[in-house]
Curated annotation (Swiss-Prot):
HAMAP family in UniProt: NorW
Enzyme class: oxidoreductase
One MF term in the entry's GO annotations: oxidoreductase activity, acting on iron-sulfur proteins as donors, NAD or NADP as acceptor
Encoding gene per record: norW
Record's protein name: Nitric oxide reductase FlRd-NAD(+) reductase
Function: One of at least two accessory proteins for anaerobic nitric oxide (NO) reductase. Reduces the rubredoxin moiety of NO reductase.
Coiled-coil intervals, chain numbering: none
Organism phylogeny: Bacteria, Pseudomonadati, Pseudomonadota, Gammaproteobacteria, Enterobacterales
GO cellular component, one term: cytoplasm
Species in which this protein is naturally found: Escherichia coli (strain K12)
């Protein structure tokens, strides 16, 4: 007996897909299988749990049972999928198997932990489950080391600092947010973090961690050591591709899909943080929302390609929030930066003076939507 559409995963991508399918078809069988509890929570909230004093259970918005009842679903929480038999169209776990007509991989991405001695002492905050496992340690920690100065690392550094903790942030790059924007643009946030008391160790490398009687000793390059109570890895995400690889699907950085979210197997699709769409991995909310809308149509028999417009990325650093869009990481752009007390507007233009990217901060963020309209598609 077929289970209709089977979705592996229960995060934001999977839930958006379910909601979009049910808007168009109330009865088609939908089965979700996931290794977690399947309770709903807002993942971006993890960047602010410490300053807001939230426990892991406080993040739950809807239980798995409520979700199943609302959308007429068959749910299998706490279930590890071990294999996909693509030829037979069967998903397998240790104790069960499910026949499918169409299969969607929404397996997400896992936090990358740098391969240094003592890496097992590093914590990650990529899910409610991960936060639940370490919330007591993080709440009690006075000294926190954050490894990675990208989007999540910068958000966490500000949040822990706002909670009154002594925060050190270490990154190989010469500036924070180095993979997103040039240093002349990120310097405003970098200065604000320093003003707040975050100790920035840039152009620096973590070489190892060791448990001590009074905490964790972090060994850095140039014969430096610091002692902290907790170490958080914020060094990026890696799409979960192991299951897709075992199924014989085409893999690059993520599970490769085309504009229809279809993998190299015509009956298997991928969505969200695990997917690589025409060569791009886009682990942000808006592209996932748009992808879920298109995939729902395609699973129900339409043939709709995904067309992604220029989209905003929000950096949730409350003391100095940023919005950015476009090709902010391009090396050949000229940046025109207008800085005022109430905020910044940075425009990245090409050789033809065409706007290709922008970053806005604080009160100037209201200008983002006007700038967004002028970016090329």
């Amino acid at each position: 007996m077929s289970n209709g559409i089977v979705i592996i995963g229960s995060g934001f991508a999977a839930r958006q897909l379910v909601k979009n399918i049910r808007k168009q078809d109330a009865t088609i069988p939908l089965t979700l299988i996931a290794a977690d509890s399947m309770d709903e929570y807002n993942k971006p909230d993890l960047s602010h749990v410490i300053s807001q004093g939230q426990r892991a259970d406080d993040l739950t918005r809807q239980t798995a049972g409520e979700f199943a009842e609302q959308f007429n679903l068959h749910l299998f929480p706490q279930t590890w999928v071990t294999d996909i038999d693509a030829e037979a169209r069967v998903v397998k776990s240790q104790n069960n198997q499910w026949q499918y007509d169409k299969l969607v991989l929404a397996t997400g991405a896992s936090a990358f932990v740098p391969p240094v001695p003592g890496r097992e002492l590093m914590l990650t905050l990529n899910s409610q489950q991960e936060y639940r496992a370490c919330e007591t340690q993080l709440r009690d920690a006075r000294r926190v080391l954050i490894v990675g100065g990208g989007l999540i690392g910068s958000e966490l550094a500000m949040d822990f600092c706002r909670a009154g903790k002594a925060v050190t942030l270490i990154d190989n790059a010469a500036s924070i947010l180095a993979s997103l924007m040039p240093p002349e643009v990120s310097s405003r946030l970098q200065h604000r973090l320093t003003e707040m008391g975050v100790h920035l160790l840039l152009k620096s490398q973590l070489q190892g961690l060791e448990k001590t009687d009074s905490g964790i000793q972090a060994t850095l390059d140039r014969q430096r050591n610091i002692e902290v109570d907790a170490v958080i890895a914020a060094t990026g995400l890696r799409p979960e591709t192991a299951l897709a690889r075992r199924a014989g699907l085409t893999i690059n950085r993520g599970v490769c899909v085309d504009s229809y979210l279809q993998t190299s197997n015509t009956d298997i699709y991928a969505l969200g943080d695990c997917a690589e769409i025409n060569g791009q991995v886009l682990p942000f909310l808006q592209p996932i929302q748009l992808s879920a809308m298109v995939l729902a149509k395609n699973l129900l028999g339409n043939n709709t390609p995904l067309k992604l417009p220029a989209m905003l990325v929000k950096i949730k650093t409350p003391e100095l929030p940023l919005h950015l869009a476009g090709e902010t990481q391009r090396q050949d752009l000229r940046w025109q930066i207008n800085t005022e007390r109430q905020g910044m507007v940075a425009r990245g233009v090409d050789d033809a003076d065409q706007l290709r990217a922008f970053v806005v901060s604080e009160d100037r963020m209201k200008e983002a939507f006007g700038l967004l309209k002028t970016l090329p598609m």
